[in-house]
């Protein structure tokens, strides 16, 4: 697999398998987390920030779907509310949209309508800029951000976990692409270690960029269980591994490619997130919660229609990194196989998905 920061992005464009057309689930999660963002803006203005004429915010891992537009609109709306309450004449909002270099910034900025940013004659003038780069390192000057938002991005890792091959060079997680019930304990340990390292780097970078008393609102995939091999966090990757294994058995994929591939993502528990934040010591936890949603919440009665929609959603955020390892030419076959496996599982109850909302404040001093 190539370097993660070169191959990790959502499906581009606006076609039927694009992220822009298949982000309904993340939109629902974002809408449920919106009160946390509103409270964060409210909190900022309850401190000394009401003296500012401009608020600087960043949406990290913004992708190219409509979620980031809702974030901008929410911040702007809350600022307009505070502007009226505080009898401000005008305020300015500077928003930086960040993602890795492969992100579809063209589709993103094409979707930025006047309804999102408004015009420069309103109570709050909004200015938006793109910032390509990895959020695991520094992106902005010191003490330059008042508010940081990130939705469904922080659980991605900078690389596949280290230490997943033996001294003899043999793969330790054969036949799987993520943690599973059959994975040896070293796999779970390696994934947690990599997440700890990467999330700590994220917090360290933000601790230098966020002003004292500034806020961060982070939404990420997570789990309720202390066991990372439970299906609530492994379901999608387990089904993909089964689909890939079937193509291996048909001679369409080399077995070694499956055995040596491990997804650079980790869905942590609330306790793991809390522990890392407290160890870092740069931020206080204002709010931490996990909430469950159905993995497949759709109105259609036809299980094939539901299965196809879920498969397209999964394809939208997994295809670039999966195709880099296994080849673009077999992607249609792979996700067709994934759909068939999924539909057979629809007879049983599917696991719920846990999302974590984490609100942090930068410690003064």
Swiss-Prot record:
It catalyses: 1,7-dimethylxanthine + S-adenosyl-L-methionine = caffeine + S-adenosyl-L-homocysteine + H(+); 7-methylxanthine + S-adenosyl-L-methionine = theobromine + S-adenosyl-L-homocysteine + H(+). Transmembrane segments: none annotated. Binds 1 Mg(2+) ion per subunit. GO terms for molecular function: metal ion binding; methyltransferase activity. InterPro entries: MeTrfase_7 (IPR005299), MeTrfase_capping (IPR042086), SAM-dependent_MTases_sf (IPR029063). Belongs to the methyltransferase superfamily. Type-7 methyltransferase family. Involved in the biosynthesis of caffeine. Catalyzes the conversion of 7-methylxanthine (7mX) to theobromine, and, to some extent, the conversion of paraxanthine to caffeine, but seems not able to convert theobromine to caffeine. This is 7-methylxanthine methyltransferase PCS1. It comes from Camellia ptilophylla (Cocoa tea).
